[in-house]
Curated annotation (Swiss-Prot):
GO molecular function, one term: holo-[acyl-carrier-protein] synthase activity
Pfam family, one: ACPS
Cofactors (names): Mg(2+)
Role description: Transfers the 4'-phosphopantetheine moiety from coenzyme A to a Ser of acyl-carrier-protein.
Listed name of the protein: Holo-[acyl-carrier-protein] synthase
Biological-process GO terms, alphabetical: fatty acid biosynthetic process
Keyword annotations from UniProtKB, A to Z: Cytoplasm, Fatty acid biosynthesis, Fatty acid metabolism, Lipid biosynthesis, Lipid metabolism, Magnesium, Metal-binding, Transferase
Chain residues that bind Mg(2+): D9, E58
Similarity annotation: Belongs to the P-Pant transferase superfamily. AcpS family.
Catalytic activity: apo-[ACP] + CoA = holo-[ACP] + adenosine 3',5'-bisphosphate + H(+)
Cysteine disulfide partners in this protein: none
């Protein structure tokens, strides 16, 4: 069938770092234990690491929303936590879905690319039905 959705997101790393450091923030709860663990291993660049993963989560939502053009938006509660970025042994990212979004995207292959350079983290997501 082909490409059914494309999403892109840019994150200001300094702004992201400020949000994450706010007292009482629940911002970190949107990251899975695995994502937080992976970031803690990269202590000098943990914020960059998480900012790029936030960009992936947002890009997945945008791609999914775009694939539902002219249909009512569906944003399940805690959707960000249901989108997890995992890496293979060589560090290549992949998206793992759980919860309601996984049920909606069962037949979809998710392609992801993420980067961070300077003060910006970015991600591109392509949803493809084979």
């Amino acid at each position: 069938m082909g490409i059914v959705g494309v999403g892109i997101d840019l994150v200001s790393i300094p702004d992201f770092a400020e949000q994450v450091s706010q007292p009482g923030t629940v911002f970190m709860t949107i990251f899975t234990p695995g994502e937080r663990r992976d970031a803690s291993v990269k202590s000098s660049s943990a914020v960059c690491h998480l900012a790029a993963r936030w960009a992936v989560k947002e890009a997945v939502i945008k791609a999914w929303s775009g694939s539902r053009f002219a249909q009512r938006p569906m944003l399940p509660e805690n959707i960000h936590r249901d989108i997890e970025v995992v890496n293979d042994m060589w560090g290549r990212p992949r998206v793992r879905l759980t919860g309601a979004i996984a049920k909606h995207l069962t037949d979809v292959t998710i392609h992801v690319s993420l980067t961070h350079e300077g003060d910006i983290a970015a991600a591109v997501v392509i949803l493809e039905v084979l």
